[in-house]
Swiss-Prot record:
It comes from Saccharomyces cerevisiae (strain ATCC 204508 / S288c) (Baker's yeast). Its main location: nucleus. Present with 2660 molecules/cell in log phase SD medium. TFIIIC mediates tRNA and 5S RNA gene activation by binding to intragenic promoter elements. Upstream of the transcription start site, TFIIIC assembles the initiation complex TFIIIB-TFIIIC-tDNA, which is sufficient for RNA polymerase III recruitment and function. Part of the tauA domain of TFIIIC that binds boxA DNA promoter sites of tRNA and similar genes. SMART domains: PGAM. GO terms for biological process: 5S class rRNA transcription by RNA polymerase III; transcription by RNA polymerase III; transcription initiation at RNA polymerase III promoter. Component of the TFIIIC complex composed of TFC1, TFC3, TFC4, TFC6, TFC7 and TFC8. The subunits are organized in two globular domains, tauA and tauB, connected by a proteolysis-sensitive and flexible linker. The modification Phosphoserine is found at residue 365. This is Transcription factor tau 55 kDa subunit. The lineage of its organism: Eukaryota, Fungi, Dikarya, Ascomycota, Saccharomycotina.
């Protein structure tokens, strides 16, 4: 097997980003090795739950040895029950002229005391950044050199691992992705629209191999025929860019190489504050439109009853006429007409909770959950809201999203029960034939 899926995440919201302290000293005693703010800790838990909800979950995590990255990966490791390895090769980028010093992260002996039972000692860093600092070009060359060496080691030492997670910093997250995609420098655009890799706090990128490194199953001997593809010949595609949809406060502290200041530094914070002061406030809308979120079950027809109908991740869902007896749906390039029916049985919608697809010994748990489609915001549809059904989050659970302030001053975790909605309506779709 080969590594065919790579997640790359930036650490959570740092304590020195708070508008008004407290600003705790680094526990490691290393300059700028600041811990996360309470808000950043909650972001890390939200990221952990999001990864838990995915079918394709990381089987191992590699983290920059700076404290904020380990705080970010800790709830992920506990929730997904995966090992965490220290990797200096994906560490922070510091310019040679940085003052007063260029931070060097702590090692396993110190960090294991702060994160007992989380960090594995069974890994030596693939590369070590120049402790005298790096120019932008030197930093980018570090990551171009890092990838083939790192992936070769992972596949050799952990041959059954196909999906991994890297937890790093803003500049490193961008440079890792751009070098993996084969770009010449980290400042280039991803497309003609000028899009770039986004790097908000606790944002998540996903890279997948364009061509699987295996061919077909040999039915004669019931074995899979593998064709190994060297790393230099593998083609990667970015399938998730700076995703923050799972964060209750959305994207925060995005950074890119057009910024002059070091990512997350005091200079970076001051520049953001000045920009915020000089920018014009966005006027509030005069009218407030009331909306109602409606959860319904949508049945999609299949041409073959023996096969499961699947929708491509990139497919666009459009709908109209939910207030009518025959609403129209467009899924990808197909058009459907719907008819309302009463749902037989029980389906539940969990608006904010993660759907659990936990792996045990490399396999998904036998519990399968019904797929529910949020058909949009509309009036006139019947939806039952049962306030008696609630769930209890565990220690690494999510906070109630309504209690999160963007100022994040004096943030404290406040775990709330969450409502679950019972779905009673369904729409059965039928293909609309072209005229």
């Amino acid at each position: 097997m080969v590594v065919n899926t790579i997640y790359i995440a930036r650490h959570g919201y740092r304590s020195n980003w708070l508008p008004e302290g407290p600003y705790p000293d680094p526990l490691t005693g290393i300059d700028s090795d600041v811990p996360l703010a309470e808000h950043g800790v909650q972001q890390a838990k939200e990221l952990a739950h999001y990864l838990l909800s995915l079918d394709n979950q990381p089987e191992a995590a590699f983290a920059s040895p700076f404290y904020r990255c380990l705080e970010t990966v800790q709830p992920i490791a506990k929730l997904l029950e995966i090992p965490v390895y220290l990797e200096r090769g994906i560490g922070e980028w510091y310019r040679p002229d940085r003052k007063p010093v260029i931070p060097v992260p702590a090692g396993y002996e110190i960090l294991s005391k702060f994160f007992p039972g989380v960090i594995s000692q069974e890994w030596d860093s693939t590369l070590t950044p120049n402790e005298k600092g790096e120019t932008e070009q030197e930093m980018y060359m570090r990551f171009k050199k890092f990838w083939p060496l790192f992936i070769e080691r992972v596949e050799k030492e952990y041959p059954n691992v196909e999906c991994i997670l890297l937890v790093t910093h803003a500049a490193s997250k961008i440079a890792l992705g751009m070098s993996l995609l084969g770009y010449d420098n980290p400042r280039m655009s991803l497309n003609e629209n000028g899009d770039k890799i986004r790097s908000g706090s606790c944002s998540l990128d996903k890279y997948e191999i364009l061509k699987k490194s295996y061919d077909t199953i040999d039915e004669t001997d019931d074995q899979t025929s593998f064709t190994y593809i060297p790393f230099s010949d593998r083609k990667w595609v970015l399938t998730m860019n700076g995703n923050t949809e799972f964060l209750s406060s959305g994207e925060e502290m995005n950074w890119n190489f057009d910024c002059v200041a070091e990512a997350g530094s005091d200079a970076d914070i001051k520049k953001r504050q000045m920009t915020k002061k000089t920018s014009s406030p966005i006027p509030e809308a005069d009218d407030q439109t009331e909306v109602e979120t409606v959860y319904i079950s949508v049945d999609i027809p299949s041409g073959n009853y023996k096969e499961r109908t699947e929708i491509a991740k990139s497919a666009i869902l459009q709908y109209s006429g939910l207030e009518t007896d025959a609403p129209l749906f467009r899924i990808g390039n197909r058009l459907y007409e719907g008819s309302w029916e009463r749902l037989v049985g029980t389906e539940l919608a969990f608006p904010n909770a993660a759907h659990v697809h936990k792996k045990t010994a490399g396999l998904l748990s036998p519990t399968e959950e019904n797929e529910t489609t949020n058909a949009g915001q509309s009036k006139g549809s019947s939806t039952a809201n049962d306030p008696n059904i609630q769930i209890q989050e565990e220690d690494v659970g999510l906070p109630d999203s309504t209690n999160t302030s963007r100022d994040h001053t004096g943030d404290k975790e406040e775990v709330q029960s969450e409502k679950i909605y019972r779905i009673k309506e369904r729409i059965v779709l039928s293909n609309v034939r072209p005229m």
